[in-house]
Amino acid sequence: MKVGIFMGSKSDLDTVSAAFGILDEFGVEYEYNILSAHRTPAQVINKITELEEKGAKVFIGAAGMAAHLSGVIAAHTHKPVLGIPLGGGAMGLSLIHI
C-alpha cells in the first residue's frame, strides 16, 4: 500500500472518489478511511501508524471547512502529506499554513 487517504466525513467520499480511478489507472495501491480529526483523533493517529506499517509512502487528507485533518496527519508522520480543501469554511486558505 503506497497511499493513505483520509476523509473527514462520508460526504467527502463523492468528491475524493474521483482520485481513486486515477490511482487505479496508474496501478497505485491505496487505502481510504473516513475519520475525523475532531471527533476521532485517536483513531486517525492509530490509522496513520497502521498505514505506515503497511508501507504507506504518502498521505492525502481531504476535508471541508478547514485543514485540520491534514494537519493532524502531518503532525504524526514524517511522510509527505497532501491536503485537499473540500469547500466551506475559509475556502481552503488554512491549507497555506501546512
Q: Model-flagged regions — what are they?
A:
Residues 12-16, 41-42, 63-72, 90-94:
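Short glycine/serine/threonine-rich phosphate/pyrophosphate-binding segments
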Residues 18-19, 23, 42-47, 81, ...:
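Generic alpha-helix signal with a bias toward terminal, lower-confidence helices
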Residues 32-52:
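N-terminal beta-loop-helix "entrance" segment that forms/cooperates
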Residues 47-89:
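Glycine-rich phosphate-binding loop
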Residues 96-98:
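Conserved small/polar residues in nucleotide/adenosyl-binding loops
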